[in-house]
């Protein structure tokens, strides 16, 4: 009796997911589904561009980043520090707010929700709260302790499909009130951390958080090159992306940087636009011809638009525009 020969199927779960998402787009249906950052950063490294990680601080920030990424057809990472999460009401509040806006705004580009510079307990809390990616910052710990905690966290996160970022060499500057001098990571230590199975690595190369001083000497691109060679195909992360000269950003991407963190520039843009609005008397309830300019929806709009402009500029600089088309 004739039997049909079984054919091997080359339809992977990843391809199936893309197909489902594509059909939903055609049908006008949106499914709220944040993704981890692993694949988008692998694609970025292979394509020699970088995905923007933009820190969020409130609803305006989240909405501004999401809508700009959608308009530019760019994958994006929403980062939140422990301090910002506390300000917004906790990790579950942040996760629910991001998921709710992602759905209501009809966002179709890949979006990851990422804990930025989390300690061990914060990373575990974010995994439980519904984040899709976490950073364990053990750079201030003795190296062997950093290794052990990273190993434990990788096992927990990967069991739930969550990506993990680790750090070697503390990033300088001030983050949530903690000030540290910038360090330059050891390529061999980077290699050991990568061997633990992390998904992407932040390595200090002279970068700092906050505003760069006038006497800043620039990125140690020679060290970055050695780290890239030592760690193979692992996507590298550049923290403190605000204020680094564009030519150094481009050079860093060429040396394997696939994720760039931006926070300070968005904060400065938001503050400047809001201050200007108030200085012009638009929020003064006694001003003539005032149309309720003190309404927070109007008061915060200039800052919201300023964040969008900054995010757009960075997406273009990082080469991410159109990568989610």
Where are these regions (language model features)?
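Short, positively charged and aromatic/hydrophobic N-terminal segments
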Residues: 10-29
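N-terminal amphipathic alpha-helix/helix-capping segment at the start of soluble metabolic enzymes
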Residues: 29-52
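Alpha/beta enzyme core
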Residues: 37-43, 59-83, 93-108, 120-232, ...
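Glycine-rich beta-to-alpha transition loops that act as phosphate-gripper elements at the mouths
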Residues: 56, 113-119, 235-246
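Short gly/pro/ser/thr-enriched loop/turn and capping motifs at secondary-structure boundaries
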Residues: 84-86, 141-143, 266-271
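Active-site proximal loops enriched in glycine and acidic residues that flank catalytic Cys/His/Asp
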Residues: 205, 240-242, 264
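C-terminal alpha-helical cap/extension of soluble enzyme domains
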Residues: 246-325
